[in-house]
Amino acid sequence: MQYSEIMIRYGELSTKGKNRMRFINKLRNNISDVLSIYSQVKVTADRDRAHAYLNGADYTAVAESLKQVFGIQNFSPVYKVEKSVEVLKSSVQEIMRDIYKEGMTFKISSKRSDHNFELDSRELNQTLGGAVFEAIPNVQVQMKSPDINLQVEIREEAAYLSYETIRGAGGLPVGTSGKGMLMLSGGIDSPVAGYLALKRGVDIEAVHFASPPYTSPGALKKAQDLTRKLTKFGGNIQFIEVPFTEIQEEIKAKAPEAYLMTLTRRFMMRITDRIREVRNGLVIINGESLGQVASQTLESMKAINAVTNTPIIRPVVTMDKLEIIDIAQEIDTFDISIQPFEDCCTIFAPDRPKTNPKIKNAEQYEARMDVEGLVERAVAGIMITEITPQAEKDEVDDLIDNLL
């Protein structure tokens, strides 16, 4: 027998009252986006559950993709069969012969949405249980926590059988908590921060600062590949490339070395906030982890934050590096993050960055520059690319493959 569909049960959105259908519709769209790489699969959703109709697609691959989608509590692969007692009996026997191992217990759990079916739920449990005994005479029934719970659902159009329940990612459907701008470098921390924001329903757009010729096409492709890894949790992501060369050269020419990182981060924050405003975002998200580097002390965070009143979410701020690496490996971003391409935060990094920068000093050094003009030109020069779960291999991929 071949699975015909996957029955999907919702997570936390079940508590959302009047907004329930908005959450469900968003989850349906997210599932459709993530499963778009399987052209045969069709997704529907109603108030109680969603369904992914396989239409011949490989169940194992689709299930692996579904495990990543936030807002799903669990799901079950389902067999669709003819709605007749004899077909149900033979189907139940076939399934049990395939999955039963010596000593296992079972029960039948039936429900009907088609109340015109010839047997009610209790009668169906008894009839199908009897069919199992015919196929496996020594099998034991156990009503509480059996090894196999064979679920039977009689609907208007057909009957559906399932026995396996697979845990989903939980969380909230991406996009139900508003939009945030993720400051995405090529490092380990910021993709993890993006993942954790996605889990709480934030629709992220990735803002990446590029400083050619100091940063290479490989560094840009690396950031896009990290973004692509995040699409499997909620669908397509807008990747915003910011030209940052002029600003970094200006900072290096007009500010003391100890303040290079502080001023760089202040400009990044200003630009990200300006993009957020234009694109209707609510928050800025970054991968800062307290004390991990010089720009991530509390004093540095205060000096950098001073350029905006927008809330800054730091999902990994209290984690140590090993905790962050564990998550990066789990979400499959770690190997990309450690590729040897420098980002714009490292190319002009001073030997002795200031760990307790003063806001008044930062403002004094910025007074030597045309801050507003620099920000405006950077924002005017952004390039936006929609990153999808699947992308064709290009020349930069080939170059990277040759280098690694």
Curated annotation (Swiss-Prot):
Residues that bind ATP: M183, L184, H208, F209, R265, G287, Q296
One Pfam family of this chain: ThiI_fer
Domain of life: Bacteria
Record keyword Transferase present: yes
One Gene Ontology term from the biological process aspect of the record: thiazole biosynthetic process
Subcellular location, principal: cytoplasm
Cellular compartments per GO CC: cytosol
EC identifiers of the protein: 2.8.1.4
Keywords associated with the record: ATP-binding, Cytoplasm, Nucleotide-binding, RNA-binding, Thiamine biosynthesis, Transferase, tRNA-binding
GO-annotated molecular function: ATP binding; CCA tRNA nucleotidyltransferase activity; tRNA binding; tRNA-uracil-4 sulfurtransferase activity
Subcellular compartments: Cytoplasm
SUPFAM superfamilies: Adenine nucleotide alpha hydrolases-like (SSF52402), THUMP domain-like (SSF143437)
Pathway(s) where this gene product acts: Cofactor biosynthesis; thiamine diphosphate biosynthesis
The THUMP domain, residue ranges: 60-165
InterPro entries: Rossmann-like_a/b/a_fold (IPR014729), ThiI_AANH (IPR020536), ThiI_fer (IPR054173), ThiI_N (IPR049961), THUMP_dom (IPR004114), THUMP_ThiI (IPR049962), tRNA_STrfase (IPR003720), tRNA_sulfurtransferase_ThiI (IPR050102)
Record bears the keyword ATP-binding: yes
Reactions listed under catalytic activity: [ThiI sulfur-carrier protein]-S-sulfanyl-L-cysteine + a uridine in tRNA + 2 reduced [2Fe-2S]-[ferredoxin] + ATP + H(+) = [ThiI sulfur-carrier protein]-L-cysteine + a 4-thiouridine in tRNA + 2 oxidized [2Fe-2S]-[ferredoxin] + AMP + diphosphate; [ThiS sulfur-carrier protein]-C-terminal Gly-Gly-AMP + S-sulfanyl-L-cysteinyl-[cysteine desulfurase] + AH2 = [ThiS sulfur-carrier protein]-C-terminal-Gly-aminoethanethioate + L-cysteinyl-[cysteine desulfurase] + A + AMP + 2 H(+)
Function statement: Catalyzes the ATP-dependent transfer of a sulfur to tRNA to produce 4-thiouridine in position 8 of tRNAs, which functions as a near-UV photosensor. Also catalyzes the transfer of sulfur to the sulfur carrier protein ThiS, forming ThiS-thiocarboxylate. This is a step in the synthesis of thiazole, in the thiamine biosynthesis pathway. The sulfur is donated as persulfide by IscS.
NCBIfam families in UniProt: tRNA uracil 4-sulfurtransferase ThiI (TIGR00342)
Homology family: Belongs to the ThiI family.
Annotated protein name in UniProt: Probable tRNA sulfurtransferase
